[in-house]
């Protein structure tokens, strides 16, 4: 395997993606088809997402819990529509040691059924509501298509939140608040802009009343679902008997929500920001934010350079910046530049003898390749600002790219043509399943998201009265 | 179910334990036998342990990663002795959807085999060493005996660390350093004293050269293993071909360690510190450290009391203390006292109209039931000190209890009698398997830990020359 990225993002997007994942050491394939492992840099990005979301969830009163991975078949099958949706991709445990287990055990494809069978025991009265619990775990859904790290794997890291409310209004406002909090995380930390709205009836979560979603567009013109928040109404509280007694001691079925996002966000981040040199990491989630490279090693001069590099590293660490000096003497500065560029480190500092003389260092930013001088004195403040600028500029650039990939179509012909070119296509729709299915069949595009607001004019498929203006696209 | 704990710790330890776990809402039973779920207070304690350990591990250069839960049977079977040890309790996946999977898939009982099959790809030269990765996940081992939350479950939360080194000395010193770091976590955060040393050959981890362990003693006289750190030597690097090229480009098999601790620490914490009123939590891991209870609600007076309570809550939160005011008007202060005592909150603050008048509040500590006055002004500093005192005293009390449960036996008769009475029994041993097995068969006691240092005199079983003075006990 050659060291650097040998595929071009524009020429062979899929091969480029795989090379970046493997060579930047974010992930690797596990021995079982469909499964991947995360190496420390990959997992560190997930930890950053987790920490950021945890803070926001805690502020809303959401607490974390733990659910086991095994769900008995009888329980998973309790909500029929839900079960039918997941059944084909469920992994089944049939034996423990030499013994056959009675009821087959499913590896959780999602935990609604398990969580709600417990909630029905835990919730007795209005005092117990709202109940808001989140679970950081994995979900398992057998993938028969070829493995794609972060995007198509049979086990994936995610969080699933499950809340219970006394009235539908509170539950619906929870659904919206969580989606907004997801958006803040994805735009704020991963620098990926998203479009929010609802899924169509056809595309909603099996068992939900409706699903809200945030969608983004990848550089290859295919849409990616970035997270969903579902209003479950009483669809689960009835079969699972999640009931509460109100202040007058009258029993009611509760109103519920569930919501989740997964490590596919990492896949999106790679695709949206990466380039032919490899990964480009937004500073907020970069495992290493600043790499310091001493340019000289020999003699007195080398010692001074190394001392300056280590001094800066200490200063940056003290300021809470994730920084490291690359002291590998056997490698050239040029090799190191390429290596850290491939790994997406947002800021590189070069310190050589000449820099030392005028008390400065060279600062290079990964996302735009620009170089500037930074004074050695008080470097932390400057570099902190620089990291902030990088984060902002990366989101800005991604926003411009997204905007450039949203097209309008006022006829079925225009829609077909636009879908072919990739990106989102905005077109009026009557809301009918037939029209949605015709588009899917003939163009391969789904309705990815129906933004808020009504529509005027006619459905571009059937000519009927338009009800909304969804975004169509081929998706991952 | 009655609200409070109805079983006595001294009369029916097992029933008491289960009631505390369920009524303090740490955990609950899942629908599948052998499995439990963690409710937010239970999971929060695990999160505290995780955070504390993560900081210490990061300081040693250990980073976190992710491994999938499915391991192919052929890979799990690669180290024969290891496989034979785990095989009887492995859950097997045989189907995904309607399709039979080829090679049966094991739910990870532990991840040595999976991790090392990857390490063999990742490690090429001395530059890649040492490699230190830790995984926070669950392990699955089918339990046929009755479920006991945190102590005997078929899936449990744990961490498993796997390191690789160029020489055996470095690996062995890693084994020791990790055990020390475990001890700091358990003694420092959970206030549980431990005894460290090695496991006997019979009790070591299957596949290890040797296992080091920390053991503690529960109030019912049974020992509990609190965490283990294994020196694997080259036992796994040979079958898994974990090799590295040294500076002269000569290939060597690497030296490895693995180590883990699990949520049974939470079980130990409940048993060691709890009392007939319920849970007693060490402040460092308590989800809620201080509960503030307003004593009056009515009229002008009530408003003043509530304002004072909320003022203190804000001050404590600002100081980083986990505090909350219990504003439930429909419940009496007495009910609340009992409720929070059952949940183990370390410090309770009571604020009533009379307290307000002299600018103070009543502070009650859970672990010793003592009450004192605390000035409302600058309460955070006082309460922070109080939490520190509680933490220290709880460890001190637990240390005294442990010391009181270590007995010496200088004859086989004395050993048998001492084992019967519960606790650790220290007795000279020749090191022979036969003597160890005789003790186990006739008394039910295992060798829990062999502390460092040699021994004089004779083995109390066979009269042969003593090699060490292990601690015998019946265990969990
Ligand atoms: Zn139509
Ligand atoms: Zn002997």
Curated annotation (Swiss-Prot), chains A, B:
Keywords: Aminoacyl-tRNA synthetase, ATP-binding, Cytoplasm, Ligase, Nucleotide-binding, Protein biosynthesis. Homodimer. Belongs to the class-II aminoacyl-tRNA synthetase family. ProS type 3 subfamily. CDD domains: ProRS_anticodon_zinc, ProRS_core_arch_euk. It is found in: Cytoplasm. It catalyses: tRNA(Pro) + L-proline + ATP = L-prolyl-tRNA(Pro) + AMP + diphosphate. Catalyzes the attachment of proline to tRNA(Pro) in a two-step reaction: proline is first activated by ATP to form Pro-AMP and then transferred to the acceptor end of tRNA(Pro). Consists of three domains: the N-terminal catalytic domain, the anticodon-binding domain and the C-terminal extension. GO terms for molecular function: ATP binding; proline-tRNA ligase activity. This is Proline--tRNA ligase. The keyword Isomerase does not apply. Its EC number is 6.1.1.15. It is an enzyme of class 6 (ligase). Pfam families: HGTP_anticodon, ProRS-C_1, tRNA-synt_2b. The gene is proS. Its main location: cytoplasm. One of its GO terms (cellular component) is aminoacyl-tRNA synthetase multienzyme complex. SMART domains: ProRS-C_1 (SM00946). The keyword Transmembrane helix does not apply. One of its GO terms (biological process) is prolyl-tRNA aminoacylation.
